[in-house]
Curated annotation (Swiss-Prot):
Gene for this chain: panC
PANTHER family named in the record: CYTIDYLATE KINASE/PANTOATE-BETA-ALANINE LIGASE, PANTOATE--BETA-ALANINE LIGASE
Entry keywords, A to Z: ATP-binding, Cytoplasm, Ligase, Nucleotide-binding, Pantothenate biosynthesis
Catalytic activity: (R)-pantoate + beta-alanine + ATP = (R)-pantothenate + AMP + diphosphate + H(+)
One Pfam family from the record: Pantoate_ligase
Protein name: Pantothenate synthetase
Residues reported in the UniProt entry to bind beta-alanine: 58
Length: 273
């Protein structure tokens, strides 16, 4: 496996790569959720690239950029163990320039849910991914459904800029108790763990209601909020696959999303119905 830190090295690697190129963009601190993406990427492509870059442009002032977990040696080891062809570990100065043209996320998609709480976040996400997609010349990109809004906005960018990329949406990986895996889970102390489980339990409550015939979105959200007490809830939403709020669940075209604070840590989760 090659360890790549500069754009020049990456360009040389890609130029000499054989077959289809699969790409897994991450911010490092790799966990089993990332590993599931990596394994799928490696199994479906002759060449696989993983990036581990804590992207400063997607963090808002006062967010956790400085304390976001960084585990470079562990990330390298995980990629090696799973057969990755190359890991790209750039510095911010390698990717960003002064006065460069910016990509702005579509207003409708980027100002709801996560975007309402984190204005400008998705602009930063698209800014770095547009660069990484072009640098890696990826045929397929693997991203998780945990960041559903990001997934949908990235698909929109791929379509808008006519990028010849297949975006592969991969299922959420959970701990045995149901907690969705996230690099930010390291912030959760033991006494807060039970409260963190309220997110997945609220989604399970919604799923059980739907399986028993409930279709009314308001009723589903009310039941979820009961499970989420006493957390500080950012949002509970029932939407279609384009993130439009809906009043009635339609199986095969519904996403239920939740965001809440556990202590000072903000967690997100969702299920696709």
């Amino acid at each position: 496996m090659q360890i790549i830190r500069t754009i020049k090295e990456l360009e040389n690697f890609v130029q000499n790569a054989s077959g289809k190129i699969g790409f897994v963009p991450t911010m490092g601190a790799l966990h089993d959720g990332h590993v599931s993406l990596i394994k799928k990427c490696v199994s479906e492509n002759e060449t696989s690239i993983v990036s581990t870059f804590v992207n400063p442009t997607q963090f808002l002032p006062g967010e956790d950029l400085d304390k976001y977990p960084r585990k470079e040696q562990s990330d390298i080891q995980i990629c090696e163990q799973n057969g990755v062809s190359a890991i790209f570990i750039p510095d911010a100065n390698e990717l960003y320039f002064e006065d460069e043209p910016l990509i702005v996320a579509p207003k409708k998609l980027s100002t709801i849910l996560e975007g309402k709480t984190r204005p400008g976040h998705f602009d930063g996400v698209l800014r770095v991914l547009n660069k990484l997609f072009r640098l890696t010349r990826a045929n397929s990109v693997y991203m998780g459904k945990k960041d559903t809004q990001q997934l949908i906005i990235v698909q929109n960018m791929i379509k808008t800029f006519f990028l010849n990329i297949e975006l592969v949406a991969c299922d959420i990986v959970r701990e045995p108790d149901g907690l969705a895996l996230s690099s930010r889970n390291v912030y959760i102390c033991d006494e807060d763990k039970c409260n963190a489980l309220r997110l997945s339990r609220s989604l399970n409550k919604a799923l059980n209601l739907i399986q028993n015939g409930e279709e009314d979105a308001s009723e589903i959200k009310a039941n979820m909020l009961e499970v989420l007490e006493p957390l500080k809830v950012d949002y509970v939403a029932v939407t279609d696959r384009n993130l439009n709020e809906i009043s009635k669940v339609e199986k095969g075209n519904t996403i239920i999303l939740v965001a809440a604070y556990v202590g000072k840590t903000r967690l997100i989760d969702n299920i696709w119905i």
